[in-house]
Curated annotation (Swiss-Prot):
Residues 252-264 have a biased composition (Polar residues). This is TLC domain-containing protein 2. SMART domains: TLC. The keyword Membrane applies. InterPro entries: TLC-dom (IPR006634), TLCD (IPR050846). Residues 237-250 have a biased composition (Basic and acidic residues). Residues 230-264 are annotated as: Disordered. The chain crosses the membrane at residues 3-23, 42-62, 77-97, 114-134, 169-189, 199-219. Residues 34-227 form the TLC domain. Belongs to the TLCD family.
Amino acid sequence: MAPTGLLVAGASFLAFRGLHWGLRRLPTPESAARDRWQWWNLCVSLAHSLLSGTGALLGLSLYPQMAADPIHGHPRWALVLVAVSVGYFLADGADLLWNQTLGKTWDLLCHHLVVVSCLSTAVLSGHYVGFSMVSLLLELNSACLHLRKLLLLSRQAPSLAFSVTSWASLATLALFRLVPLGWMSLWLFRQHHQVPLALVTLGGIGLVTVGIMSIILGIRILVNDVLQSRPHPPSPGHEKTRGTRTRRDNGPVTSNSSTLSLKD
């Protein structure tokens, strides 16, 4: 499956880059006119999260053997979904490198590097696909996070839609991010004798990295959206740090990444 998986990942890379190109040809909300690149990037990320997160949830529901045997038990199409996600993270990483400064995106790039390394193991070996499918459940929470950022970008906070999205982000963070991360950590600990040491190390680093980022992000959303009377615009001390860099096609671009921010 390795050659097919690589072809799928390559096609996915081109498809998500093409989607970004197509979104640039569509009207951008007037309120997000100053942050058009960020709007396009978030829309592409939302599309991937909905596709991969929903696919992982349906797949694990229809084929529970993927959770029972995360190493060997999986249908053929599950590996295709994992390869699609590899292509997306490579495309998003290229987009970040092209449009934002390294100082503003190093955390996201490190996150993407770890994720691509882990998912690529399943694509190249044909094993650990069930484990990868469980990890894609995190994208259900990512979909809420991307929608929340889009609402912030379009100046829809505070609003009922933003409040619902904030609560949904916290709920899915617990259910579809922290729970799967805990399950994967426990499985890796119990089955470490069946997994090569290099993969145990890689998986452990990935789980710790994403886990820390997830907890910090959850605390920030809880404080900014729930405990405070109203959400504040992004600032250096909050979830996002804004800076500008000249985009290669036209006009300035506003970056939206800060230390330990999360976008998967």
